[in-house]
């Protein structure tokens, strides 16, 4: 039977999750990714209970697919090592039904990509424009010179989304949150660290996340003007954090063995204001393209996963609505003339309006909260930082965990 066709712009976590969720709803999917291949190196990602529930809804076991670690504790420390707050992941599992996990980002994206049919991903291909004038069925233009007719376009093209700029030209765009971030993976099986931690200094932070294979996902931030770069990030990290508590110096020793290109540095931006809607015609925005947020809650990828799963859930099944070639071809161009385009348009339009209603307020609340948490972590004034530390230490652990309920229990499939 002919299938509806979706074109996904971007093969990040949000785009690949959307592609897989749509595929399992019966859609034919084409993913256009500008990179020549999926990255083999990079950073890690924490998957919170809300993201794990969303993945479970489409039959993805992230822990099994990508290899995961469950830390014993999670919390925030001072540079001298004193814990400001700490939570056992067993308590989180008891409260939320599942413990958060940490996975290598390259392994996770590779697992999502491997679950898609052969030929779904088109590497080295950028979506350059979407021709949907007059409300007609979109034609996706690509850098490879191919025109892809689509019943749905998923704009998962990242924080600098070209499709967002094209369709929301009056939007304020991105907001620099005042920090740069370094991210890296280091191999240190000798350390055997049980805790996921973030250490707050004055205007700088250092995070440690154990992975399952003896590696650690490390990140660090510093308050600097945008565009600030050092000649060697390894030296910069040792200079900034070498005197902090154990095991940070030992981890920095492992960083010395990395190549400079193994350390990713990005200035941190979020969306200056929410988009008025998360859809236009038959285009839906998700992840950073829709609601770029600071990484301070570990929810950027998690919210992208929620977006993708809820979008696919709300859309009509993909195996209806076309006459075309009988569905045997794998080329979406062969399916360019659906028999009931009006019905297809109406069904998709209704689903996308429901998607905006389901996702816009939640994702913007997370974006705003992440910015506020980042401001706390980035305080440079000694008195303000000391007051912050006292306030965090004085907050009971149960109350702090309860404060995460809206995040970790917030995923729901709309009726």
Segment roles from a protein language model:
Residues 1-6, 23, 48-168, 172-185, ...:
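Conserved N-terminal helical subregion
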Residues 190, 202, 212, 222-299, ...:
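FAD/FMN-dependent oxidoreductases across multiple families
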Residues 15-16:
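N-terminal Rossmann-fold NAD(P) dinucleotide-binding loop
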Residues 9-10:
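Conserved N-terminal Rossmann-fold NAD(P)-binding element of oxidoreductases
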Residues 23-43:
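Glycine-rich FAD pyrophosphate-binding loop
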Residues 177-209:
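Flavin-dependent oxidoreductases
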Residues 2-4, 65, 81, 250, ...:
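C-terminal helical "tail/cap" subdomain of flavin- and related membrane-associated enzymes
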């Amino acid at each position: 039977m002919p299938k509806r066709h979706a074109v996904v712009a971007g093969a990040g976590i949000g785009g690949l999750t959307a592609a897989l969720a749509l595929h399992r709803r019966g859609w034919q999917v084409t993913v256009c990714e500008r990179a020549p291949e999926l990255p083999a190196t990079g950073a890690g990602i924490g998957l919170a209970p809300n993201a794990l529930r969303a993945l479970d809804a489409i039959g993805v076991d992230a822990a099994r697919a990508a290899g995961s670690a469950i830390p014993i504790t999670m919390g925030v420390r001072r540079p001298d090592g004193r814990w400001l707050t700490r939570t056992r992941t067993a308590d989180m599992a008891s409260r939320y039904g599942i413990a958060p996990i940490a996975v290598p980002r390259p392994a996770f994206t590779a697992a999502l990509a491997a679950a898609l049919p052969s030929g779904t991903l088109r590497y080295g291909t950028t979506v350059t424009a979407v021709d949907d004038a007059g409300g007609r069925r979109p034609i996706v233009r690509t850098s490879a010179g191919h025109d892809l007719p689509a019943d749905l376009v998923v704009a998962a093209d990242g924080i600098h989304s070209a499709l967002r700029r094209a369709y929301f030209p009056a939007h304020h765009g991105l907001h620099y949150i005042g920090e740069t971030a370094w991210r890296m993976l280091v191999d240190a099986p000798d350390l055997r660290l049980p805790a996921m931690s973030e250490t707050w200094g004055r205007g700088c932070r250092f995070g440690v996340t154990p992975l399952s294979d003896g590696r650690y996902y490390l990140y660090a931030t510093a308050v600097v003007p945008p565009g600030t770069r050092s000649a060697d990030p390894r030296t910069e990290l040792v200079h900034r954090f070498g005197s902090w508590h154990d095991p940070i110096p030992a981890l920095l020793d492992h960083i010395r063995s990395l190549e400079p290109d193994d350390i990713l540095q990005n200035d941190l931006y979020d969306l200056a204001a929410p988009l008025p809607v998360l859809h236009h015609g038959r285009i839906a925005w998700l992840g950073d393209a829709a609601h770029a947020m600071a990484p301070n809650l570990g929810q950027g990828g998690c919210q992208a996963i929620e977006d993708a799963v809820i979008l696919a859930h709300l859309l009509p099944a993909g195996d209806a609505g076309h006459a075309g070639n009988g569905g045997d071809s794998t080329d979406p161009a062969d399916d360019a003339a659906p028999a009931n385009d009006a019905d297809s348009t109406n069904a998709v339009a209704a689903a996308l309006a429901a998607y905006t209603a389901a996702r816009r307020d939640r994702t913007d609340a997370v974006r705003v909260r992440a910015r506020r948490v980042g401001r706390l972590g980035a305080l440079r004034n000694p008195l303000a930082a000391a007051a912050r530390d006292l306030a965090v230490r004085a907050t009971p652990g149960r109350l702090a965990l309860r404060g995460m309920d809206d995040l970790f229990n917030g995923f729901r499939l709309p009726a």
